[in-house]
UniProtKB/Swiss-Prot annotation:
This is Gasdermin-C. Cleavage by CASP8 relieves autoinhibition by releasing the N-terminal moiety (Gasdermin-C, N-terminal) that initiates pyroptosis. Palmitoylated. InterPro entries: Gasdermin (IPR007677), Gasdermin_pore (IPR040460), Gasdermin_PUB (IPR041263). The keyword Aminoacyl-tRNA synthetase does not apply.
Length: 474
């Protein structure tokens, strides 16, 4: 049992309880979220979040020199500790033809961390004072960097890191497990006597986190207009990074999202008809997923096979999934080994139907997968191998559709006809998937309670199961 870097950073965010505080998902990215580093976001869904991607540049690198930089405030070190331990013990009686006896088993797991973090931040008051005195925060360099142009053409919003929580000293996250089996038997027929034995195994895993690694961060949106750059201080202000940019030159992904957003969000119902807002109406999630399924179905069988067969082995390594997302979001089809490399090879071929954005489809799947935990990804891999995706999708749909619009807890009962095809191991795997989304599931009970916190991961799971089932049917 091991606490991963992802789990540590998420746990730290919960402990700090800071508004708009976000965890860093991968240890390899822990040095890419420094103050003033620029992030971009390329969401593929209206219903689940995408991760922030570092573009590899700092705000200080795209602005003209000699502008005043607000002084950073550093907090006092904050010690954070979390230790968990679990122990199971069982005794088993054995009755056989030639022997009677018993066996005992003990299984112990423990994991945790003991770290110290400090905050480096620029208060909003300092940023606001600077912008009030000087207008926009700074002028862009005359030679605009290529990533700024690419984001402008794709209408991607850019953000700047304004606060980080970093580790103050080298730390090791440790997890250990041990199994102890022992038994004794009386041999009663062929040989008179007693036999006994014992078997032990201990495993220890270590994850070093170096001093300076960033566990969590806060960000603010950038607004770039008339060759100047400003930081949007209010999260409620509705403004894009590149205001006034029209649709010319938009990527196919952006065009797809624009069509989806325009047709769903800007739709005005006829007079006298009341309709739910997009985020409260399940039919809009269903339309979004249906659109992705239709596009996947238009791909050749060979391309669909490549995507499905190479996604499966990647589910055991969320770091690889995250690295692939970063590469695709930055439009850098570089080198990766293994299954991720084969998917990149398929993208380089550009052999899919011209009007289908294969990269956008893969990003949609990857972003949905990253909403799930590592445990859920393992369970999903087992579901793919057992070919129970269709049954799971219908079960998830039966939960989402009637409860999607409710912000409060509502008891519900899973439909017996949907549970029937998921007997034994398949049902156990499905229940664990649902528990990972935030639903309270009991092994021998179809009853549960709707929780608003489960809405986003369930929406992501619904999209994943629908798209993967389409790939299975190819």
């Amino acid at each position: 049992m091991l606490y991963t870097f992802d789990q540590v950073s998420k746990d730290v965010v919960k402990k700090l309880q800071g508004k708009d505080l976000r965890p860093v998902r991968c240890l390899s990215d822990a040095t890419k979220f420094r103050q003033f580093d620029i992030l971009q976001k390329t969401p593929q869904s209206l219903f689940f979040k995408s991760e922030d991607t570092p573009v590899g540049y700092s705000l200080l690198q795209i602005l003209e020199p000699n502008f005043p930089v607000p002084e950073t405030e550093v907090s006092a070190p904050m010690p954070l500790k979390h230790i968990t331990s679990q122990k199971w013990k069982a005794d088993v009686d054995v009755k056989a033809t030639i022997a009677d006896g018993g066996a005992s088993a003990e299984f112990v797991q423990s994991c945790g961390y003991d770290i110290e973090v400090q905050s480096r931040s620029i208060p909003d008051s300092k940023l606001e004072s600077l912008q009030n005195r000087q207008g926009p925060w700074g002028k862009l360099l005359d030679k605009k960097l290529s990533f700024v142009t690419d984001c402008q053409m794709g209408r991607n919003n850019l953000y700047v890191v304004t606060e980080v929580f970093e580790v103050t000293k080298d730390t090791v996250v440790q997890g250990s497990s041990s199994i102890d089996l022992s038994g004794k038997a009386l041999v009663s027929q062929l040989v008179k006597g007693e036999a006994q034995g014992q078997w032990q195994r201990e495993t220890t895993d270590l994850v070093p986190i170096p001093k300076g690694a960033v566990l969590a961060y806060k960000k603010k949106q950038l607004v770039i207009e008339n060759n100047t750059c400003a930081i949007l201080l209010s999260a409620n202000a509705k403004k894009k990074t590149f205001p006034g940019i029209f649709n010319f030159g938009m990527s196919s992904r952006s065009q797809t999202m624009e069509i989806v957003n325009s047709s769903w969000i800007d739709y005005i119902p006829p007079i006298g008809r009341i309709e739910e807002p997009v985020h409260l109406d399940f039919k809009y999630l269903e339309k979004e997923v249906f659109l992705r399924k239709e596009q996947l179905a238009m791909l050749s069988k060979d391309v669909q096979d490549v995507v499905f067969s190479n996604l499966l082995p990647m589910l055991s390594d969320s770091d690889v999934l995250f690295d692939l997302i970063n590469m695709l979001e930055l439009d850098q089809l570089g080198h990766m080994d293994g299954p991720a490399g084969l998917i990149l090879d398929e993208l380089r071929k550009n052999s899919s139907t011209p009007w289908i954005d294969l990269k956008g489809l893969i990003l949609y799947l990857l972003q949905a997968l990253m909403v799930l935990s590592d445990t859920q990804l393992d369970l999903l891999a087992q579901s793919m191998e057992m070919r129970i995706l269709l049954q799971q999708r219908e079960l998830v749909r039966s939960i989402l559709e009637p409860n999607f619009k409710y912000p409060w807890n509502i008891p519900f009962t899973l439909q017996p006809q949907l549970l029937a095809p998921l007997q034994g191991e398949g049902l156990a795997i499905t229940y664990e998937l649902l528990k990972g989304c935030g639903l309270k599931m009991e092994p021998n009970s179809p009853r549960s309670t709707w929780d608003l916190e489960a809405k986003m991961p369930l929406s992501a799971l619904y999209g994943i199961l629908s798209c993967l089932q389409q790939l299975v049917e190819a």
